[in-house]
Amino acid sequence: MQWNKSGFLVPAPGSPPGASFAQHCPFSPEAPNEDAIAGELFPAAPFADARIGRFEAAYVGHASEQPFRPNGSSGGLTSWVAAELLRTGVVDAVAHVAPTDPESGRHFAYRLSCSLEELNAGAKSRYYPVELSQVLGEIRATPGRYAVVGIPCFIKAIHLLKRVDPVIGDRVTHTLGLFCGHMKSAAMVESFAWQLGTELARVQALDYRIKNESRPANWYRTHLDLAGGGSAEQDWWHLADGDWGAGFLQNPACDWCDDVVAETADIAFGDAWVEPYSSDGRGTNVVIVRTPKLKALIERGRADGRLILEPVSADFIVKTQAAGLRHRRDGLAYRLSWHRSGIRAVKRVTPSAALPLRRKLVYRLRYAIARWSHPMLRLARACRNRAIYTLWARSALRLYQSVAWSRGRFGRLLDALLPPPERLS
């Protein structure tokens, strides 16, 4: 795999896909969808919901056992479950994303952790392009039982690969999913560095979400460690491209995904983006458990007092992810209705343009921002003038927020002409 011009990892030239590629690419129209895969994996699940899939139980809460909650971006439950699988001998190693030396050309990468110390060093959210080829090679080379942590499309890809690769099928025994809004380009790090008054080459490490117990959990703040011992940090909302919902530097594939909550994972974790949890700076998870064995593991943690969890309904989970689900349901249906040449995505959402005009404008603007942010950043880099990108991004953000949030004079004018959209965040 190698970087493309937009900061995404793509197959290197001379690496043609194999004959079975169309059957195990998660975005291929020829591959089974999430419903089909989950139906095979969790046939006896007592609950099935069109929005969050099949499941055994759902919870909201956090890990009370140290150091999982303080070390994580949210409630610490992803790391706790991965650690519990390791220390009870259920798996021999966990494949997860961890920081790496930027001299390698990447700030984060998948690795295999065989100890709790290694696992804890990889805690926290990483909105950075990664790929699985190296760890899959290590799994093929070393017999054992492995858990894989990943976003929905990665977990789906693992299950599709298990169908055609018997070694992976035998050795990957557990999948831990992460809820996903969309993924960002590696260029996001460069943009943040520019806006914090430094250069990408000086960034030695970064934290996309610093945890501060005195601030609401949804007040994202990024932190950069710089060469020479310095650092820089800033709240996302002060950054030109810091509005997550606007889609700056988004991976194009994310506009054609309909799985927010990792419906094919054995267990999946997200942030509890509803009050009172979103105001709790310590972080709170929502969890969807899809297998009886992992439900038993969770219940043992609750009984021991190591987990503080309350059972919740599918409707509660949906409320915590309302914005992402709208974008992957109503928004995806609208995008699927557009005329496009080439391969057309086949999704579980029916194409439809039956939306109010104002909401159509919101989705069109998100799509345009996601597409144009990449060439604008490249232009700024080529001209050695970061203002080309940041001024464009701030202008695009003002237009987007006027349409989506009725902000500014133009937003008020639009309100007089068109009913404001449902709050989309």
Task: Annotate each PLM feature.
Residues 72-77, 101, 148-158, 182-184:
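Gly/Ser/Thr-rich loops at beta-strand to alpha-helix junctions
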Residues 179-191, 211-215:
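Short, conserved secondary-structure transition motifs
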Residues 164-177:
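A short alpha->loop->secondary-structure connector
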Residues 1-62, 109, 274-277:
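Non-heme iron-sulfur electron-transfer modules
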Residues 91-92, 201-425:
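Long, compositionally biased charged/polar accessory segments in the mid-to-C-terminal portions
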Residues 72, 77-86, 90-140:
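Portal/gating segments that form or line small-molecule/metal binding sites
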Residues 1, 19-29, 151-157, 249-262:
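Local cysteine-cluster metal-coordination motifs and their immediate loop/turn environment
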Residues 59-82, 89-94, 357-370:
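N-terminal, charge-rich interaction modules
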